[in-house]
């Protein structure tokens, strides 16, 4: 009968056993295989499209662009989001499986950009619709900045606990696809009372309730969830 010979342990020989936890293994697998859903609506998406080329080669990060939200765990919102597009964006986000992440790319996505001052149809920040993990400012951001944002997201994934994230998302579900306009409370119109202005030389001495006059026929429209 042949005897079994055990080779002596050599320090040069690498260890074949790796000790880890299921949470760390899950985080490592998710950060190494992010599948983004491309949601480009403006010029910022052109900068992101350059990452697919050989110069930046974002495939080395395990990024595989998907066209279906049910196969993606990351959505990059690049460009202006309007009121009509808001329900579609929220619907795409809700169709993504858990855990899922969001990168807001560009000034128009984060704050509305140059359309935030006098546009009646622009959403002032995509975080009013869906929770955002990484904000990437710029007009537009460079491809190097996009890679840096993905790197920061990977670092965030490596430190998170899966159960805590699921509970936090269920608790903070402030987004919905039922975005409608409704008639809100009545407010003052801001019209000046010419009678008070002609009598008193000092405007600061007039109480606000007397300075403005109310009109019952005017009401405001509020964008609500």
UniProtKB/Swiss-Prot annotation:
<dbReference type="GO" id="GO:0008137">
    <property type="term" value="F:NADH dehydrogenase (ubiquinone) activity"/>
</dbReference>
<keyword id="KW-0874">Quinone</keyword>
<dbReference type="InterPro" id="IPR006137">
    <property type="entry name" value="NADH_UbQ_OxRdtase-like_20kDa"/>
</dbReference>
<feature type="binding site">
    <location>
        <position position="139"/>
    </location>
    <ligand>
        <name>[4Fe-4S] cluster</name>
    </ligand>
</feature>
<dbReference type="GO" id="GO:0045271">
    <property type="term" value="C:respiratory chain complex I"/>
</dbReference>
<feature type="binding site">
    <location>
        <position position="43"/>
    </location>
    <ligand>
        <name>[4Fe-4S] cluster</name>
    </ligand>
</feature>
<feature type="binding site">
    <location>
        <position position="108"/>
    </location>
    <ligand>
        <name>[4Fe-4S] cluster</name>
    </ligand>
</feature>
<dbReference type="GO" id="GO:0051539">
    <property type="term" value="F:4 iron, 4 sulfur cluster binding"/>
</dbReference>
<dbReference type="GO" id="GO:0005506">
    <property type="term" value="F:iron ion binding"/>
</dbReference>
<keyword id="KW-1278">Translocase</keyword>
<protein>
    <recommendedName>
        <fullName>NAD(P)H-quinone oxidoreductase subunit K, chloroplastic</fullName>
        <ecNumber>7.1.1.-</ecNumber>
    </recommendedName>
</protein>
<comment type="function">
    <text>NDH shuttles electrons from NAD(P)H:plastoquinone, via FMN and iron-sulfur (Fe-S) centers, to quinones in the photosynthetic chain and possibly in a chloroplast respiratory chain. The immediate electron acceptor for the enzyme in this species is believed to be plastoquinone. Couples the redox reaction to proton translocation, and thus conserves the redox energy in a proton gradient.</text>
</comment>
<keyword id="KW-0472">Membrane</keyword>
<keyword id="KW-0520">NAD</keyword>
<comment type="subunit">
    <text>NDH is composed of at least 16 different subunits, 5 of which are encoded in the nucleus.</text>
</comment>
<keyword id="KW-0813">Transport</keyword>
<keyword id="KW-0004">4Fe-4S</keyword>
<keyword id="KW-0150">Chloroplast</keyword>
<dbReference type="InterPro" id="IPR006138">
    <property type="entry name" value="NADH_UQ_OxRdtase_20Kd_su"/>
</dbReference>
<dbReference type="GO" id="GO:0015990">
    <property type="term" value="P:electron transport coupled proton transport"/>
</dbReference>
<dbReference type="GO" id="GO:0019684">
    <property type="term" value="P:photosynthesis, light reaction"/>
</dbReference>
<dbReference type="GO" id="GO:0048038">
    <property type="term" value="F:quinone binding"/>
</dbReference>
<dbReference type="Pfam" id="PF01058">
    <property type="entry name" value="Oxidored_q6"/>
</dbReference>
<keyword id="KW-0479">Metal-binding</keyword>
<comment type="similarity">
    <text>Belongs to the complex I 20 kDa subunit family.</text>
</comment>
<dbReference type="GO" id="GO:0009535">
    <property type="term" value="C:chloroplast thylakoid membrane"/>
</dbReference>
<keyword id="KW-0793">Thylakoid</keyword>
<keyword id="KW-0934">Plastid</keyword>
<keyword id="KW-0411">Iron-sulfur</keyword>
<keyword id="KW-0408">Iron</keyword>
<feature type="binding site">
    <location>
        <position position="44"/>
    </location>
    <ligand>
        <name>[4Fe-4S] cluster</name>
    </ligand>
</feature>
<keyword id="KW-0521">NADP</keyword>
<keyword id="KW-0618">Plastoquinone</keyword>
<dbReference type="GO" id="GO:0009060">
    <property type="term" value="P:aerobic respiration"/>
</dbReference>
